[in-house]
Amino acid sequence: TFYDESCPDVSNIVRRVVQQALVSDERAGARLIRLHFHDCFVNGCDGSVLLEDQPGVVSELAAPGNANITGFNIVNNIKAAVEKACPGVVSCADILAIASVGSVNLAGGPCWEVQLGRRDSRRANLQGAIDGLPSPFENVTQLKRKFDRVDLDSTDLVALSGAHTFGKSRCQFFDRRLNVSNPDSTLNPRYAQQLRQACSSGRDTFVNLDPTTPNKFDKNYYTNLQSNTGPLTSDQVLHSTPGEDTVKIVNLFAASQNQFFESFGQSMINMGNIQPLTGNQGEIRSNCRRLN
């Protein structure tokens, strides 16, 4: 791979730090893969999501889709460990890609061969983040449009949404579905009652995205959608929208974890290949949050 000569141990270094983070934070893996996803969907996988406001940069973190995004401290720890071994060599964009494999695999999911050699951008794109990031309130047509913009298809949409087999969501992103006088017909009534109870302590309360095996990377995300127990609209619509090709794909992954794992790895590679900066474009940031 790209770092064979310059930083041969990079994957192990990253994996070790992710493993350490998981000891005290069960959501560490979900945080990291979400950063990679939100990075790739805006100007390609260029580390732009990590930049904070600074001279010449208006951060993407002000976009609604990035409002609750976390995990920067873990990225900083990974970057520090990698810099110690190979200073000035590995980009922050590549760190997110490598960390995503470790995050999934350490939770019981698949491995895939990450292509490396991305460079870090010297700019952010706030408007791109506002327009391009999928929202938890969207229907299949809206979601497909956003995936299509970055050349990802329906299989990619359904496979990558499967990353919601771990991690959590705040109640504010689905509580409009819990209205007692106007119940959402695609939400299991018993499960809706559990969610109402969980969310009674406030809209900022966190709830597991996968109520069955919340920290395990498995196919239960899809079987949950079959039983109408996906808390987010943007997940449930993949199975509950009649006539959409996404329904068949959900059923396929629900029936075969091997099929899901294989497709997930391929879709992660596809996503990781969105418009990377290479060669002498961009830079290798020494601090992932700041331009050099």
Curated annotation (Swiss-Prot):
UniProt: Ca(2+) 1 binding residues: 39, 42, 44, 46, 48
Q: Which GO terms describe its biological process?
A: hydrogen peroxide catabolic process; response to oxidative stress
Keywords on this record? Calcium, Disulfide bond, Glycoprotein, Heme, Hydrogen peroxide, Iron, Metal-binding, Oxidoreductase, Peroxidase
Its domain of life reads Eukaryota
The kind of enzyme this is, by top-level EC class, is oxidoreductase
The positions annotated for binding heme b are 164
Q: Which cofactor does it need?
A: Ca(2+); heme b
Q: EC number(s) per UniProt? A: 1.11.1.7
Return the Pfam families for the record. Answer: peroxidase
Q: Which InterPro entries match?
A: Haem_peroxidase (IPR002016), Haem_peroxidase_sf (IPR010255), Peroxidase_pln (IPR000823), Peroxidases_AS (IPR019794), Peroxidases_heam-ligand_BS (IPR019793), Secretory_peroxidase (IPR033905)
Q: Which reaction does it catalyse?
A: 2 a phenolic donor + H2O2 = 2 a phenolic radical donor + 2 H2O
Q: Which cysteines are joined by disulfide bonds?
A: 7-86, 40-45, 92-288, 171-199
List site positions: Transition state stabilizer: 34
Q: Which residues bind Ca(2+) 2?
A: 165, 210, 213, 218
Annotated residues that bind substrate are located at: 134
Record text on cofactor binding:
Binds 2 calcium ions per subunit. Binds 1 heme b (iron(II)-protoporphyrin IX) group per subunit.
CDD domains on file: secretory_peroxidase (cd00693)
> Which residues bear sugar attachments?
68, 139, 179
List, from the UniProt record, the residues annotated as the active site of this protein.
38 (proton acceptor)
Which GO MF term does the entry hold, naming one?
heme binding
Functionally, this protein is described as follows: Removal of H(2)O(2), oxidation of toxic reductants, biosynthesis and degradation of lignin, suberization, auxin catabolism, response to environmental stresses such as wounding, pathogen attack and oxidative stress. These functions might be dependent on each isozyme/isoform in each plant tissue.
Q: Which family does it belong to?
A: Belongs to the peroxidase family. Classical plant (class III) peroxidase subfamily.
In terms of PANTHER family, this protein maps to: PEROXIDASE 58, PEROXIDASE 72-RELATED
What is the protein named? Peroxidase 2
State the organism of origin: Cucumis sativus
